[in-house]
Amino acid sequence: MTTEPNSPFVDDPLSAVDARILGSLVEKQATTPETYPLTLNALVLACNQKTSREPVMNLTPGQVGQSLRQLEGRGLVKLVMGSRADRWEHTLGKGLELVAPQVALLGLLFLRGPQTLNELLTRSNRLHDFDDVEQIRHHLERLAGRGLAVHLERRAGQREDRYMHLLGSQADLEAAVAAMGSDPERAAPAALSADAEARIAELETRLAALEERLTRLEGGV
């Protein structure tokens, strides 16, 4: 593991729920701008999505709501008051002084853990238009220089180095490194292509929007 500056979150790290919320907001801002910012219900569905999430979670509205209040206090999310429902948006760019490519990369690292440059290039196609892996490497190095990401050197049996975010706890980092050692290529059963994942994610988003609309209609009866 390459030595990087201490993370500014070392004394108050993000929880796994915090990271999932922020990653989901980053993703939906890019992929479904027509429904962003997200209501609490839509955000819960995004967090619990079955695709493009490692690991898959089953969070409750109470868990997400509690985490949102904590993130709001840290200046990482913002509540947008609405006539029908309150909505939430992330403020990572402003809160951490990041440019759009860096926000996109952090979002992916929040959602799927340590990833290779090629994985990030493939998975980022709906979040930001990166030219190549070298452009991704450049922004990751900028993040690492501020203690927000870390370069994990490949181990025996692995073909590529990986990167992960450093906004979580030391225990999260150690667990990720240990997982890399026990499962070098992180083999996944029946891995989906990026296009297939995108189509499934879009369907899940449409379903979430329909469920939210139905809830509003029932509430107006």
Curated annotation (Swiss-Prot):
<dbReference type="InterPro" id="IPR007432">
    <property type="entry name" value="DUF480"/>
</dbReference>
<dbReference type="InterPro" id="IPR036388">
    <property type="entry name" value="WH-like_DNA-bd_sf"/>
</dbReference>
<comment type="similarity">
    <text>Belongs to the UPF0502 family.</text>
</comment>
<dbReference type="Pfam" id="PF04337">
    <property type="entry name" value="DUF480"/>
</dbReference>
<protein>
    <recommendedName>
        <fullName>UPF0502 protein PSPA7_1674</fullName>
    </recommendedName>
</protein>
<dbReference type="InterPro" id="IPR036390">
    <property type="entry name" value="WH_DNA-bd_sf"/>
</dbReference>
